[in-house]
Design a protein with these regions (language model features):
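Conserved adenylate-forming
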Residues: 1-5, 13, 93-94, 100-119
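Conserved ATP-binding/catalytic segment of the ANL
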Residues: 1-61
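Adenylate-forming
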Residues: 15, 29-30, 48-77, 106-143, ...
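Generic recognition of flexible, low-complexity loop/linker segments
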Residues: 37, 47, 73, 83-86, ...
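C-terminal boundary motif of the adenylate-forming
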Residues: 40, 45, 79-105
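Short Gly/Ser/Thr- and Asp/Glu-enriched loop/turn motifs at secondary-structure junctions
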Residues: 54, 90-94, 164-166
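Short hydrophobic/aromatic beta-strand micro-patches
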Residues: 54, 60, 98-100, 172
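Conserved C-terminal "lid"/linker of ANL adenylate-forming enzymes
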Residues: 84, 125, 150-214
Length: 214
């Protein structure tokens, strides 16, 4: 079943009875016979279970709505120009996002470089961009690029409830990196570090909160 906070709870003969010699952990994760998975998800009408995120990563908006950032972030990353998406919304009136651009897609779609000649290494992609007399800021600060992404965001927003929809976004001047502490070695985003590194950009998204938050 799904708890009030969205966490998936399991019960059955195939579920463990507890942790070996660790009653404290057992009492934490198994309450009234229900195993608390730590996953957030939903169960459809046919009984299929869908995991949408981890409970520890769930945002709670200022109006008390639970928001699973990972699902929204992965959906927005389907936009070709987007490399990374970082959702903001915990204790906020509405959701916003930080986007980084996919330089490989810029080289292919905006400059017309043959995809077979585009290097995989991000630093080499930046060099190719510069070799073609462009800088990344030519695109991160480009109004047409912003409008193109905004159109895609508005379409994808229709897949989510109003509290989950991205109302504002910022295109960052560079991608997230391992060296800056924003990505793990397996390229998962580190939320705390991104919040710290880009705090001013995040604050700017909430200077004026005149949006429809439903």
């Amino acid at each position: 079943k799904v708890a009030d906070d969205g966490e998936l709870l399991l019960k059955g003969d195939n579920i463990m009875k507890g942790y070996y010699n660790n009653p404290e952990a057992t009492n934490t994760d198994i309450i009234d016979g229900w195993f608390h998975t730590g996953d957030v998800g939903k169960v459809d009408e046919e009984g299929f279970v869908f995991i949408t995120g981890r409970k520890k990563e769930i945002y709670v908006s200022s109006s008390g709505k639970n928001i699973a950032p990972l699902v929204i972030e992965e959906t927005m990353k389907s936009i070709p120009l987007i490399s990374q998406c970082f959702l903001i919304g915990d204790d906020k009136k509405y959701c916003s996002a930080l986007f980084t651009l996919d330089v490989g897609v810029i080289l292919r779609d905006k400059i017309g470089i043959d995809i077979n000649t585009i290097p995989k290494d991000p630093l080499q992609q930046i060099k190719m961009l510069e070799d073609n007399s462009y800088t990344l800021s030519d695109f991160t600060e480009n109004e047409d690029i912003f409008n193109e992404i905004e159109e895609s965001v508005n379409k994808l927003n229709m897949e989510f409830s109003n509290p989950e929809q991205i109302k504002k976004f910022k295109i960052l001047p560079r991608d997230f990196t391992i060296d800056d502490g924003e990505l793990t070695p397996t390229l998962k985003i580190r939320r705390k570090q991104i919040n710290e590194n880009w705090s001013k950009a995040i604050q700017a998204l909430y200077v004026s909160e005149n949006v429809n938050d439903g």
